């Protein structure tokens, strides 16, 4: 499955992009005046191949898994919180769940590695094992387990497509996963540890220093093939990270627009884009996470955050907010009149076609 997906991803429909841009530029407004909404609508057309789109059926896919490195004291919350919050996703009481309900977004929650035998009703069970190994002592998982996690993410998108979802978000739950994400990002781009290690869900200074030391050491000790994203996941990642990477790959393969949440989500988008550089064409951002590594990862991906709301929750919480903005972009494209449709003579625009006619540079 994985090789088929990696080889089968095709780029945007450039002919439709040209047509969509011409339509947007002909709408009864100053050129470019709806800013990012215009860019979103045009790229959405390039993804779907349709001029007019709607995202009336929306879903955030959440991957839940435990991380062995938690035993090193890199997180303030106990490991049991992974299971408890996964249950709360289903109850609709978490941050992402309440935001999702506010604009008609569904959640699809997967157990890919929670450290528990409990089967949670409403959660799709794809458990690879009960948590990963402790990356401070040994690789997180085998290479085959890493591939399996990717394929679970791809399968999740297939399920979402069959259910008729038109846009996806990517979220997670897993105590210790800002540590694994920081290690993955460091391995991906070769940056300083201090640039990628933040305080996650909250830790004291002693734990923060320990977290930085662990990330520094694990990237050196496991003989990582830095040119192989799957090997990076297997050595210092997590099942949640692998499955989320698979969601981004699957979204590109099945041509479904997909929204990046915060730090962990953007790291997995970057992993997917390293596996196939066309992936980012299908990705929309949401918010600028306050977790320190986010800015480096989004810059490496070549995208800009849509919003800055001082958020740092994770879970996929930024995705429903971005869905609303994307809804506005589709409303513009679908319902706004062109100059011709509005019986407006736009000949006056001939002298003000350049950006400098609208913005003081």
From Swiss-Prot:
Look up keyword Glycosyltransferase and say if it applies: yes
UniProt cross-references to SUPFAM superfamilies, sorted A to Z: Nicotinate mononucleotide:5,6-dimethylbenzimidazole phosphoribosyltransferase (CobT) (SSF52733)
Reactions the enzyme catalyzes: 5,6-dimethylbenzimidazole + nicotinate beta-D-ribonucleotide = alpha-ribazole 5'-phosphate + nicotinate + H(+)
Q: Does Transferase show up as a keyword for this record? A: yes
Which CDD domains does the record cross-reference, listed alphabetically? DMB-PRT_CobT
The molecular function GO annotations come to: nicotinate-nucleotide-dimethylbenzimidazole phosphoribosyltransferase activity
EC number(s) from the headed UniProt entry: 2.4.2.21
Q: Name one GO biological process term.
A: cobalamin biosynthetic process
Enzyme class, UniProt record, top EC level = transferase
Protein keywords: Cobalamin biosynthesis, Glycosyltransferase, Transferase
Q: In which pathway does it act?
A: Nucleoside biosynthesis; alpha-ribazole biosynthesis; alpha-ribazole from 5,6-dimethylbenzimidazole: step 1/2
- What positions does UniProt annotate as the active site of this protein? 315
Listed as disulfide-bonded, the cysteine pairs are none
What is the documented function of this protein? Catalyzes the synthesis of alpha-ribazole-5'-phosphate from nicotinate mononucleotide (NAMN) and 5,6-dimethylbenzimidazole (DMB).
The record's comment on protein family reads: Belongs to the CobT family.
Identify this protein by name. Answer: Nicotinate-nucleotide--dimethylbenzimidazole phosphoribosyltransferase
């Amino acid at each position: 499955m994985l090789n088929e997906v990696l080889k089968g991803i095709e780029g945007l429909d450039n002919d439709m992009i040209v047509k969509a841009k011409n339509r947007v530029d002909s709408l009864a407004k100053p050129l470019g005046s709806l800013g990012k909404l215009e860019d979103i609508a045009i790229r959405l057309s390039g993804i779907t191949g349709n001029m007019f789109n709607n995202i009336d059926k929306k879903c955030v896919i959440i991957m839940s898994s435990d991380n062995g490195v938690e035993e090193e004291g890199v997180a303030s919350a106990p490991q049991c919180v992974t299971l408890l919050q996964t249950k709360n996703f289903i109850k609709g009481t978490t941050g992402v769940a309440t935001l999702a309900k506010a604009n008609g977004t569904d959640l699809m929650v997967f157990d890919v590695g929670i450290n528990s035998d409990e089967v949670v009703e409403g959660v799709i069970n794809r458990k690879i094992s009960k948590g990963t190994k402790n990356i401070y002592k040994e690789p997180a998982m085998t290479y085959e387990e890493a591939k399996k996690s990717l394929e679970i993410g791809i399968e999740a998108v297939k399920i979402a497509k069959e259910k008729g979802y038109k846009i996806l978000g990517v979220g997670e739950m897993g105590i210790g996963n800002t540590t694994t994400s920081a290690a993955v990002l460091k391995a991906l781009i070769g940056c300083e540890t201090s640039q990628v290690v933040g305080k996650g869900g909250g830790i004291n200074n002693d734990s923060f220093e320990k977290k930085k030391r662990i990330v520094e050491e694990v990237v050196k000790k496991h003989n990582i093939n830095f040119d192989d994203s799957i090997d990076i996941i297997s050595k210092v990642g997590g099942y949640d990270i692998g499955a989320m990477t698979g969601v981004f790959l699957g979204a590109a393969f099945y041509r479904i627009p997909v929204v990046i949440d915060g730090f962990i989500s953007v790291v997995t988008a970057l992993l997917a884009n390293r596996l196939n550089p066309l992936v980012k064409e299908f990705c929309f951002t949401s918010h600028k996470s306050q977790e320190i590594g986010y800015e480096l990862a989004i810059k490496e991906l070549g995208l800009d955050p849509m919003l800055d709301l001082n958020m740092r929750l994770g879970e996929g919480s930024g995705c429903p907010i971005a869905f609303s903005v994307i809804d506005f972009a589709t409303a513009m494209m679908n319902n706004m009149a062109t100059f011709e449709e509005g019986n407006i003579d736009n000949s006056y625009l001939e002298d003000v076609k350049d950006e400098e006619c609208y913005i003081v540079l």
